[in-house]
Structures are given as structure tokens and as C-alpha cells.
């Protein structure tokens, strides 16, 4: 396989791994970080750590996944995904298709 394709695949796998590790390491946030007001009628604080809607959506999805799946299943999925990525890279590196 061409070195350029290997470099692209390696970059994508590295980016995906970093994204997954960041997601796992992120701590759960209170509802005020999502912009949800409490029943007392107070407005959410717009402090210096303003978050984009994409980060809020990511945090919402992470909370949904954490509440629906046990932690062991999440860890097993991440380890399996990393193992499959490594095996895919080894397959690409070792097996060179014959033309």
C-alpha cells in the first residue's frame, strides 16, 4: 500500500483514539452547562467557560450512553475498537495485495 494512504489511516486512527480517550476522561457536567434552567427560575451563568452547542450535545450523548450501558460494556467496546484498529493496520501493513 502507498505510504500516503498508510499515513492517512494512521492519522485517522490516532485522531479517533484521542477523541475516545478525551470522551472517557471528561467528567459529567451539571445541567446548567447544557443551558437548562432550574425550577427556581434562575438563568444559567454565562461565565468565562462558554461552551459550544457541539460540546453540549457531545456531553448529552455521553450522559445518555453512561446511563443506558454499564461501565464494563463501555470499556469493553473501547478496548475492542482499539484492538480492531490495530489489527486493521497490521493487516494493511503485512498483507500487500498482488496486482
Swiss-Prot record:
Tree of life domain: Eukaryota
Keywords of the record: Cell membrane, Membrane, Signal, Transmembrane, Transmembrane helix
UniProt keyword Metal-binding, yes or no: no
Cellular-component GO terms for this entry: plasma membrane
Cytoplasmic side of membrane: 95-99
Keyword Mitochondrion (UniProt): no
Membrane topology annotation: Single-pass type I membrane protein
Name of the protein in its database record: Small integral membrane protein 9
Species this chain originates from: Homo sapiens (Human)
Gene name for this UniProt entry: SMIM9
Amino acid at each position: 500500500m502507498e505510504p500516503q494512504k498508510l499515513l492517512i489511516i494512521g492519522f485517522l486512527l490516532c485522531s479517533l483514539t484521542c477523541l475516545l480517550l478525551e470522551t472517557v476522561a471528561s467528567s459529567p457536567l451539571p445541567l446548567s452547562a447544557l443551558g437548562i434552567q432550574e425550577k427556581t427560575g434562575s438563568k444559567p451563568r454565562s461565565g468565562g467557560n462558554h461552551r459550544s452547542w457541539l460540546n453540549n450535545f457531545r456531553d448529552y450523548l455521553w450522559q445518555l450512553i453512561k446511563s443506558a450501558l454499564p461501565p464494563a460494556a463501555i470499556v469493553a467496546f473501547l478496548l475492542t475498537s482499539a484492538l480492531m484498529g490495530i489489527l486493521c493496520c497490521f493487516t494493511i501493513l503485512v498483507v500487500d495485495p498482488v496486482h
